[in-house]
Amino acid sequence: MMTVKRRIFDRIRNALTLAFGLIYLIPLYMAVTNSFKTYADIIKSPLALPTAPTLDNFVEAFHASNIASLYGTSILITVSSVALLILISSTAAYVIIRRNNGICKFLYAFALIGIMVPPVVTLVPSIKTLSMLHLLYKPSGLLMFYGGAYFSTTIFLYTGFINSIPISLDESAYMDGASTITIFFRIIFPLLKPCTATAVILMGMWIWNDFLNPMYILGSTAGRTITTGIYNAIGAYTSQWNLVFANVILASFPIVILYLCMQKQFMSGLTAGAVKG
């Protein structure tokens, strides 16, 4: 009886897995295949493989959408935001774990509240604050927003990892005359590579793919990111879906490369966090 129930459960689970997998894979399949088709081929058979693949869509989209400028703005904001998050979160996590007093525990618990609050909820108050600080419509304003919005998640990653590092390493370095800053940056931080890789990929992906926050915080005066630029391109190319799909692939390319380059460290960070955290 249990075997029959188990088989039914497995079939339902597999069917649901397949259904949800198709929901995610079909749009990806369409974006990739249609980016290599002409407009006529897309209208004729949007789900078919390209019979005569062409790279003209990418060339035209690259020049027409000014992808180079969009890449530059997005890379500047993403790299700066991720670097700021890693620096602040790792040092804060180190102090919280090593001090381990009531104040640090309270501040850590207070910081984790941000995980339960979606960044979009804080968008309007953040816009008001940035306007008061004269940072609205400036890349530095968006940088500050990301630093606050994703601080909770990043410090959560680092505290779990640093907690697994023996304090005896610090004590030995103190006996040799090393300062706290030297101990952290020369001994502790190099041990955080798996956690840092996880943070880089997660934060980099979220910030690179973010659309709503750059649209409102940067506006149209401080330069467009890759997502807001693609949004404007879609408005201009509603009758040229081959260019729309090419733009989407060009926007996704850097994140795919980042993941492929850091895949080993990313998986190591996830498994280490699961075992040690």
Spans of features found by a protein language model:
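A structural signal for multi-pass alpha-helical bundles of membrane permease subunits
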Residues: 3-277
